[in-house]
Amino acid sequence: DLEMNGVPKDNKEAFESSHMEIIEIGAVALDEDYREIDSFLTYVKPRFNEIIEPRYEEMTGISTAMVKDAPGFEVAFEQFFRWCIDLDKEYEIITWSSNDELQIRHEMKQKKYQMSNEVKQFMNGWKDFQKIMGEMLGLERVLSLEKAIELMGLDFQGRQHDALNDARNTAEIYAVVFDDKRDKEALNRVKEALHPKTEGASLGELFDFSQFVQS
């Protein structure tokens, strides 16, 4: 999972490539039994706006002081990449929505990051679990991570919009969906809530439209 800060509009070249810059990368690794075996977390120092804007600080809890001595995007991404490939020769990158993959690609362009063949292969293997789950449940709109956790009757672990916490909650939903040993009652609650019983709920309550709003 990623957390981000805005790029100033007056920096036209940088803003055209990406309106945002990554300020935190968080991930967890699951074994074949869907148990967490490792985690990754780093802050990232933004290049084009070193001041964390108040709305993003409030949302993420990340302050300017917290990223002041953090690695830049290139180093932080390499650390994350190496962490992934050092875990196992066979791995899958699972994200909640395609936004994280797209942000990394946009930021690579923005910062003129040169991808090695190994990194290209790594970037081509990401899976959008939000989309996969939506197709499994026959959803026509985007379900937010927080709403998925809520509808499953699970407790959101930690603070929202914390990269590691969001990654852990995504992993929890992934385990509920794919681990045959897990009770499927939580998944059934989502199906029941989103099909015949959605009439009394507004779309804003059930679905996440934030990814369609451009900063």
Regions found by a protein language model. Name each.
Residues 123-132:
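A contiguous pocket-lining binding segment that forms or flanks enzyme active sites
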Residues 172-215:
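Acidic two-metal-ion nuclease catalytic site recognized across multiple nuclease folds
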Residues 107-111, 151, 176-180:
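Active-site catalytic microenvironments for nucleophilic, acid-base chemistry
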Residues 99-124:
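Substrate-recognition/cap helix-loop segment adjacent to the acidic, metal-dependent catalytic center
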Residues 2-101, 105:
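Conserved non-catalytic scaffold segment of RNase H-like nuclease domains
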Residues 4-6, 131, 169:
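Short, glycine/acidic-enriched loop or turn micro-motifs at the edges of active sites
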Residues 44, 51, 57-60, 64-67, ...:
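Active-site-proximal helix-loop-helix substrate-binding element of RNase H-like nuclease domains
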Residues 162-175:
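Acidic, divalent-metal-coordinating active-site segment for phosphoryl/phosphodiester hydrolysis
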